């Protein structure tokens, strides 16, 4: 007997006249008609009639799933996507979009990192001679060749697969968490969801970010495992978390502003423009640009705190040291290549993610239509 099945037991009552509880059943045709009309799909049961009482028992069963046939799925291939768990589809979309975007923009990221960490790598006095954008491009080509522009990209891709996937999936989850009593998401709720998503993804993948930085800016070619073992042996496990504080502080407002502006601008567009890829792309560029301009100084601080031999132990100390040495402009070193990298990077991620969400919604509608058609056909028989 199934564990979730209802059980009805009868107990004899000695003092009760048995003639009062003799049961009778309706005619077979009547019972069959009852089953067809009342117990057709969602339930099963039986009933009895007697002089003492009339007992009717109906056991609820699972609703029948009018699953699509193979032929129906072949005729409506988009419906196959709806069979994949939604969270898994969003996770995969975020991972692939992030990896593609990072690989395309890897040369700009390498240039930015060299510009940001120039002073720490060469010593505080040498930092006065800031390396420029063109100079960084020339330096990489001269010393390392074309492949030097992608140095450190492998750990970056390995990191960005879970990072991007977790971030985008977490954002959707946090948005549901921060909805108000009216089931609406306020601006504050969107900002909070973005901040929490950014910190969650950063915390989970931070050691790979530090490893990627060391591979990108330290001289010579070494493998990921060689750099990781060197860090562990010379600096300890804590070296994988250098700069975590400013990273969390920096990523929280960046993702909050970026995602919030993207959502709000898309929401304000007329209905006919919301579903266009061009609208998503332009909105993503705008949101990424504002977020980058606002939060870039914290990125410079965290990068300098991640370096071996850094003199900075806290965020205020790093801010003061950079401003004292280079002025306010020092906080924006590498901003140009970062902007050139971040705008397409973030735009590709958000646009791809937005398109995949719409694709998932369309596939769910197709699958529902197939199920409804199957149900109507079954009931008509």
Swiss-Prot record:
InterPro entries registered for this protein in UniProt: Mit_carrier, Mitochondrial_sb/sol_carrier, Mt_carrier_dom_sf
Keywords per UniProt: Chloroplast, Membrane, Plastid, Repeat, Transit peptide, Transmembrane, Transmembrane helix, Transport
Coiled coil residues, start to end: none
Gene Ontology cellular component terms for the protein in this record: chloroplast; chloroplast envelope; chloroplast membrane
Transit peptide feature, positions: 1-26
Chief site of localization: plastid
Bilayer-crossing regions: 78-98, 154-179, 191-211, 237-257, 281-301, 334-360
Sequence positions that bind ADP: 159, 302
Localisation per UniProt entry: Plastid, Chloroplast membrane
Bilayer topology: Multi-pass membrane protein
The organism's place on the tree of life at top rank: Eukaryota
Solcar repeat intervals: 85-177, 185-268, 279-359
GO biological process: response to nematode; transmembrane transport
Family: Belongs to the mitochondrial carrier (TC 2.A.29) family.
Biological role stated in the UniProt entry: Transports adenine nucleotides.
Protein name as annotated: Probable envelope ADP,ATP carrier protein, chloroplastic
Organism: Arabidopsis thaliana
